[in-house]
């Protein structure tokens, strides 16, 4: 991915210099395999400074429609700056739970929707998963740094009809028990 990201002090970024590209490329590959619609209802939850939104724009063009949601106002401002050239990009500074509550009040997402979710180590949690089930996006890409939280969050999704299309794991912290997992789910 040929894109530069600016980060404020204290903003989250992967420690290894190649990790962000590795994860972004995998997310883009999964989106392509799912039949990602750049003009669909697309959301990048816990979107940080806009890594995955930027990667999707690099792959699908600057007309991409995507909303990046991030609780940290500083990171959301960074995302707004990092995605300024993407015509359909929005950056929302809200906790994901509150954003999804508002979004769910408008009914289900359209059939061309994709949601990328990259929660903190604790996972998305039941409230977010319940809202995603209510919104029923056609495609989900879940990026996780804790396999226990991931399995807890995947259980209700798969019980509700989501099928795991692909799972990829990355050892970004050699000689530790930590690894990143990316899961592609389709309904």
Residue ranges of model-derived segments:
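Rossmann-like S-adenosyl-L-methionine
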Residues: 1-187
């Amino acid at each position: 991915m040929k894109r530069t990201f600016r980060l404020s002090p204290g903003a989250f970024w992967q420690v290894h210099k190649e990790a962000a590209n590795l994860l972004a490329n995998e997310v883009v590959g999964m989106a392509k395999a799912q039949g990602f619609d750049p003009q669909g209802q697309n959301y990048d939850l816990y979107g940080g400074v806009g890594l995955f939104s930027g990667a999707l724009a690099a792959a699908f063009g600057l007309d991409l429609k995507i909303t990046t949601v991030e609780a940290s106002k500083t990171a959301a401002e960074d995302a707004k700056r990092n995605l300024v050239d993407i015509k359909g990009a929005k950056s929302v500074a809200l906790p994901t739970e509150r954003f999804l509550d508002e979004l769910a009040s408008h009914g289900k997402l359209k059939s061309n929707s994709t949601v990328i979710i990259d929660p903190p180590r604790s996972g998305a949690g039941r409230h977010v998963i319940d809202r995603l089930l209510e919104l029923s996006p056609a495609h989900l890409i879940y990026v996780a740094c804790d396999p226990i939280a991931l399995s807890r969050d995947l259980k209700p999704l798969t019980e509700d009809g989501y099928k795991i299309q692909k799972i990829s794991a990355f050892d970004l912290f050699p000689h530790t028990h930590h690894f990143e997992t990316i899961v592609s789910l389709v309904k």
